[in-house]
């Protein structure tokens, strides 16, 4: 397999590896995600009922209140946060939340993550150098 590596823009430094969870819907961390469990509680959201805990969360951008940054921090303190985030374009609420929570975040990839990635793929997000790398496609027989 030829490795897929996509360059992007660094928003929050750090490196993390995990399984992709994709949403085409924006996320408001205040009111849409339970800060204790990491479960998306917004009924009409595409991720309703799913946990973002330990995932590499892919979504277009954030929405809603500036308090969302502190909800992200609360998720991290509760062990319920995503391990990394990939956005199409990050806005200040999610950027601040990722930085204060030390969650690696990359956006503006050279190719849309919706074209390159799918739920269950394992990727590394390198927020320090501004890239993501597909480690293991979903269903791959590659041994870890």
From Swiss-Prot:
Heterodimer composed of a large subunit (PMDh-L) and a small subunit (PMDh-S). The active site is at 65 (proton acceptor). Pfam families: AcnX_swivel_put. Its EC number is 4.2.1.182. The keyword Mitochondrion does not apply. Transmembrane segments: none annotated. Belongs to the AcnX type II small subunit family. GO terms for biological process: isopentenyl diphosphate biosynthetic process, mevalonate pathway. CDD domains: AcnX_swivel. This is Phosphomevalonate dehydratase small subunit. One of its GO terms (molecular function) is hydro-lyase activity. HAMAP family: PMDh_S. It comes from the Archaea. Keywords: Isoprene biosynthesis, Lyase. It comes from Methanosarcina acetivorans (strain ATCC 35395 / DSM 2834 / JCM 12185 / C2A). It is an enzyme of class 4 (lyase). Component of a hydro-lyase that catalyzes the dehydration of mevalonate 5-phosphate (MVA5P) to form trans-anhydromevalonate 5-phosphate (tAHMP). Involved in the archaeal mevalonate (MVA) pathway, which provides fundamental precursors for isoprenoid biosynthesis, such as isopentenyl diphosphate (IPP) and dimethylallyl diphosphate (DMAPP). Pathway: Isoprenoid biosynthesis; isopentenyl diphosphate biosynthesis via mevalonate pathway. It catalyses: (R)-5-phosphomevalonate = (2E)-3-methyl-5-phosphooxypent-2-enoate + H2O.
């Amino acid at each position: 397999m030829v490795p897929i590596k996509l360059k992007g823009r660094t928003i929050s430094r750090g490196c993390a590896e995990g399984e992709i969870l994709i949403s085409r819907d924006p996320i408001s961390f205040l009111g849409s995600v339970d800060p204790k469990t990491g479960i998306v509680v917004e009924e009409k959201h595409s991720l309703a009922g799913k946990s973002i805990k330990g995932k590499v969360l892919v979504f277009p951008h954030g929405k809603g209140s500036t308090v969302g940054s502190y909800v992200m921090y609360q998720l991290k303190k509760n062990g319920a946060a995503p391990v990394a985030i990939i956005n199409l374009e990050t806005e200040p609420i999610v950027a601040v939340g990722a930085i204060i929570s030390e969650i690696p975040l990359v956006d503006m990839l050279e190719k849309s993550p919706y074209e390159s990635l799918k739920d269950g793929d394992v990727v590394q997000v390198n927020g320090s150098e501004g890239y993501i790398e597909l480690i293991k496609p979903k269903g791959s027989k590659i041994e870890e």
